[in-house]
Amino acid sequence: PSGHFCLTYVQKRKIPEKFFDNLYFTTNYEKFIKKLIPDCDKELVPDARLVIPFYDHYNELIAVTGRSLESGSKVLRYVTVRTNDSKDKLLFGMDTVDLNQPVRIVEGQLDSLFLNNCIASGDGNLSIAAKNVDCKEKILIYDNEKRNKEILKMMHNSIELGYKVVIWPDYIEAKDINEMVMSGISPDAIEEIISNNTFSGLEAQTRFTFWKRV
């Protein structure tokens, strides 16, 4: 309903309204998961969360992520639970992606909602996610965190593996797609930035070297 704090949260993050029907809310994530998956043995939190469902190519529910609506260093921001016993890499957005077109791969589920034909890894292991996507062209879009050693290591590895990687221009200060949108950059403008800053091979290595030093 209008004014609800979860609705206020997604509106504040400027999530496109067309996705509102695909997102859910629970006042108690632990109870929600126990009802959905009675034999779940994962440690859960009994707090209010935005619920983000994962579906496969066949529109079968394969997992859910609970995104905390609170902030703070002690808050576990994301809690993801599978609905099956699969060991495959979890990917968000596989129910809507067109594998005949270039596929963008980002870290965050909410970030993926702002880009065309985009899926999310749910973590920084984008090259592992890419291995699990059967399409001709994949573009890896890491968070804009040049001070994060883990991100740098994974970006370097992806470039070495030959993937196309986005090297964010220096004037971009936001750390991820959602923050860029919240700072006033339109999704269309972000699409253009991505298009103009996607590199592979030697050019990616060169630009990556300069980017991480700035």
What residue spans do the PLM features occupy?
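Short, exposed beta-strand "edge-strand" segments with a Pro/Gly-rich flavor and a Y/T-containing core
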Residues: 9-14, 82-95, 168-175, 179-183
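TOPRIM metal-binding catalytic domain and adjacent DNA-binding surface shared by DnaG-type primases
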Residues: 1-51, 55-58, 97-98, 159, ...
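Phosphate-handling DNA/RNA-contact segment within nucleic-acid enzymes
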Residues: 31-137, 150-152
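TOPRIM fold recognition
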Residues: 74, 100-103, 109-214
